[in-house]
């Protein structure tokens, strides 16, 4: 998403984003054509492990999803995790499996089922795509993701209503969804709080990794 890219970008780091799979593939391929030494899937994720709170940072060892099992680069992953030592992220960082999905996973039941079947700590819609491209090009691949919505929380429909295919958001569809079902407001406000915590973790992780 756009806010994730704004956090990630900086000297020596080109950040690309999109919400639709084909647009993600195109954006990554265009970035690779300009030259890069590897790919890091950096951003937010939905929690699957029931003990992980919003703001937990995950450095993935493997990504399981629609494209199979994709291993991350052990050296890059270790360097990312080790960079957190002595920083605010150190107490909130874990290593383990990530899951990839083709559509948003918003329900508590669906999250629980995916956790039971994969053992993944968290889930996103981009890491498996980035990993497959990295593997095809022979490039190092790593994942750094911060949990927004924990495993025990379902997302209201309004949470995804404003997401555009290009990864940006617009407010009007969210407002329309709230007008249709005002009872979603409480859950949306809780999600906003979780998102602030995750964003703080991402900013701290970015500073720890790249300075």
Question: Where are these predicted regions, by residue range?
Answer:
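Glycine-rich phosphate- or other oxyanion-binding loops that anchor nucleotides, phosphorylated ligands
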Residues: 1-211
């Amino acid at each position: 998403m756009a806010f994730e890219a704004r956090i990630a970008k900086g000297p020596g780091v080109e950040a690309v984003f999109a919400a639709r799979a084909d647009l993600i593939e195109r954006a990554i391929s265009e970035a690779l054509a300009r030259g890069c030494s590897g790919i890091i899937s950096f951003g937010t994720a939905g929690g699957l492990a029931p003990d992980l709170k919003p703001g937990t940072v995950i450095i993935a060892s493997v990504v399981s999803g629609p494209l199979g099992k994709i291993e991350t680069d052990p050296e890059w992953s270790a360097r990312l995790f080790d960079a957190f030592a002595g920083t605010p992220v150190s107490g909130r960082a874990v290593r383990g499996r990530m899951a990839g999905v083709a559509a948003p996973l918003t329900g508590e039941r669906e999250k629980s089922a995916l956790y039971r079947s994969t053992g993944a700590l968290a889930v996103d819609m981009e890491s498996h795509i980035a990993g497959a491209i990295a593997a095809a090009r022979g490039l190092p691949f790593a994942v750094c993701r911060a949990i927004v919505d924990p495993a025990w929380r379902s997302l209201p429909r309004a949470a995804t209503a404003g997401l555009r295919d290009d990864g940006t958001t617009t407010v009007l569809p969210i407002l329309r969804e709230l007008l249709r079902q005002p009872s979603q407001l409480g859950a949306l406000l809780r999600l906003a709080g979780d998102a602030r915590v995750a964003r703080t973790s991402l900013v701290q992780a970015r500073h720890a990794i790249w300075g």
